[in-house]
Each structure stands twice: as structure tokens, then as C-alpha cells.
């Protein structure tokens, strides 16, 4: 009988001018981006945490602390690959990724397929195993006021 594990990931980053908006490894044209030690890819960070959590391997901060200058400006897909590889080393395979980006703007619907494809390629999955959804916060709280962006992800692993 196979062993099924589920991991939940969440991340938030402040909106900042002079930064790129990178979501799921895709640069989205925008007059602002997300602030962070790495490239601040809020989606990649949430999925990374979900993989690590499902495999009981800690969290992204444990593996890539923001106090370490090696990760300054780092492409967050590096983090995602690392989590994938660690889970694989423990005998797990990623079965499914479901994620949500919560952001007032820019509107992301035109980037959905590109983001899904980039994530699927990075995780070595068929694209039909990667879901990316977009929501707004309906003008409520820091996300709704356009001051931050959040992402949530749930990952299923099988051994």
C-alpha cells in the first residue's frame, strides 16, 4: 500500500517599487514587484514549503535563511528544485500541486498557463498535475489594500 502525505504552504511579501514581479518563475510585467531577500516569488515559496512540510523536512527558512547572503536575489525555482530533490531522496514523488495567489493587481489570468508550465517543468510533473488559481482580497487587509501579495499551496506526495 502506498503512503500519501499532504503539505500546506503559505507565504506573503510586501509590494515594492523597483522590484520585478516574479510568480512561479515567470516575470509578470508590472510597475512594481515583491520585496524579499531572494527574488520574492511568493508562489514558489509557498509550494516549496508545502513540499518540505509534506515530507517532514522543515520549512524554507530552515533550508534557505534570509540571513545567508548566498540567497540574496536568488531565483526561487532553486528552492523549489531543492525541495523536490529532498522529497525524492526520501522516496516520495509529487502527485499534485494546487495553489492560489492572492493579489489585487496585476490581473494574472493571461499568465496562468505559462506559470503552470514553468512549475511543472521545474517539478518534473505533467502540467495537468499543477493548478494555479488567482484571487483578490476584495479590498480587505494589506493584500486588499495593494500593500502585499500572498500565496497558498497544497502538495500531495506519494511513496
Curated annotation (Swiss-Prot):
Which residues are a divalent metal cation-binding?
A: 11, 13, 45
Which catalysed reactions does the entry list for this protein?
Answer: 4-CDP-2-C-methyl-D-erythritol 2-phosphate = 2-C-methyl-D-erythritol 2,4-cyclic diphosphate + CMP
Could you confirm whether the keyword Ion transport appears in this record?
A: no
State the signal peptide span. Answer: none
Q: Which cofactor does it need?
A: a divalent metal cation
Q: How is the cofactor bound?
A: Binds 1 divalent metal cation per subunit.
Q: Give the UniProt keywords, A-Z.
A: Isoprene biosynthesis, Lyase, Metal-binding
| Pathway recorded for this protein | Isoprenoid biosynthesis; isopentenyl diphosphate biosynthesis via DXP pathway; isopentenyl diphosphate from 1-deoxy-D-xylulose 5-phosphate: step 4/6
Report the EC number(s), separated by commas if there are several: 4.6.1.12
Which GO terms of the molecular function aspect are on file? Answer: 2-C-methyl-D-erythritol 2,4-cyclodiphosphate synthase activity; metal ion binding
One of this protein's GO BP terms? terpenoid biosynthetic process
Q: Which InterPro entries match?
A: MECDP_synthase, MECDP_synthase_CS, MECDP_synthase_sf
Determine if Lyase is one of this entry's keywords: yes
Domain of life of the organism in this record?
Answer: Bacteria
Q: What residues does the record give for site: Transition state stabilizer?
A: 37, 136
Which residues make up the binding site for 4-CDP-2-C-methyl-D-erythritol 2-phosphate?
Answer: 11-13, 37-38, 59-61, 64-68
How is the subunit organization of this protein annotated in UniProt? Homotrimer.
Tell me the function of this protein.
Involved in the biosynthesis of isopentenyl diphosphate (IPP) and dimethylallyl diphosphate (DMAPP), two major building blocks of isoprenoid compounds. Catalyzes the conversion of 4-diphosphocytidyl-2-C-methyl-D-erythritol 2-phosphate (CDP-ME2P) to 2-C-methyl-D-erythritol 2,4-cyclodiphosphate (ME-CPP) with a corresponding release of cytidine 5-monophosphate (CMP).
- Sequence similarity: Belongs to the IspF family.
- Protein name, as recorded: 2-C-methyl-D-erythritol 2,4-cyclodiphosphate synthase
- The organism is Solibacter usitatus (strain Ellin6076)
Organism ancestry: Bacteria, Pseudomonadati, Acidobacteriota, Terriglobia, Bryobacterales
Amino acid at each position: 500500500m502506498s503512503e500519501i502525505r499532504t503539505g500546506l504552504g503559505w507565504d506573503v511579501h510586501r509590494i515594492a517599487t523597483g522590484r520585478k514581479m516574479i510568480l512561479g518563475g515567470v516575470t509578470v510585467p508590472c510597475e512594481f514587484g515583491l520585496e524579499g531577500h531572494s527574488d520574492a516569488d511568493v508562489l514558489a515559496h509557498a509550494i516549496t514549503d508545502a513540499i518540505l512540510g509534506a515530507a517532514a523536512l522543515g520549512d524554507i527558512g530552515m533550508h534557505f535563511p534570509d540571513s545567508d547572503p548566498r540567497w540574496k536575489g536568488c531565483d526561487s525555482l532553486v528552492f523549489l528544485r531543492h525541495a523536490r530533490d529532498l522529497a525524492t531522496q526520501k522516496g516520495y514523488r509529487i502527485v499534485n500541486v494546487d495553489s492560489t495567489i492572492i493579489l489585487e493587481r496585476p490581473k494574472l489570468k493571461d499568465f496562468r498557463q505559462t506559470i503552470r508550465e514553468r512549475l511543472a517543468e521545474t517539478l518534473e510533473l505533467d502540467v495537468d498535475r499543477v493548478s494555479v488559481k488567482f484571487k483578490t482580497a476584495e479590498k480587505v487587509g494589506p493584500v486588499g489594500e495593494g500593500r502585499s501579495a500572498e500565496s497558498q499551496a497544497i502538495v500531495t506526495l506519494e511513496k
